[in-house]
Regions:
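Intrinsically disordered, low-complexity terminal tails/loops enriched in metal-binding residues
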Residues: 25-147
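Sec-dependent bacterial lipoprotein signal peptides
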Residues: 1-26
Length: 147
């Protein structure tokens, strides 16, 4: 036999789960902020580097592993070849990361770095973050991608 306290506890739990589900579904269909910058070139957060991303083709495909070129230069325009670069990212509105673990696999020279293992498994607003450590210092770049 259920007591009034256990019935209230069940009702609270069901209400909390329903509210969480409703909020999650609202996030899935929410639009990105209007001021999102989708450009493929930018200055790092601390101003130490300028960078550009170049996907393999004209468009960024969904559901396929990709290779990108990350071009890095100092704020003064000198190519950055000897950099340690960490790659991360995800979907801000969905609260999850990338489905793969992309990484910079080698320096190509003249400031270019090969990024392998990038994959986007659904349409929407994604961010790709690069944390760069080189002679000029450590700094971060964030690129917005829309599929």
């Amino acid at each position: 036999m259920r007591t009034a306290a256990s019935t209230r506890s069940i009702i609270r739990t069901v209400a909390a789960v329903a509210t969480a589900g409703l909020l999650s579904s609202c996030m899935l269909f929410a639009r990105p902020p209007k001021d999102v910058d989708y450009s493929r070139a930018r200055t790092s957060e601390g101003g130490l580097y300028r960078a550009a991303i170049r996907p393999q083709g004209d468009s960024i495909p969904r559901g396929r592993l990709q290779r990108w070129t990350l071009h890095l230069e100092t704020a003064q325009g000198a190519p950055v070849d000897n950099a340690a670069v960490a790659v991360d990212g995800g979907m801000p509105q969905h609260g999850h990361g990338l489905p793969t673990k992309p990484r910079v696999t080698r320096a190509l020279g003249n400031g270019d770095h090969l990024v392998e293992g990038i994959k986007f498994n659904m349409g929407g607003w994604w961010v790709v973050k690069f944390r760069v450590r080189a002679a000029a210092g450590t700094d971060s770049l964030l690129f917005n991608v829309r599929l």
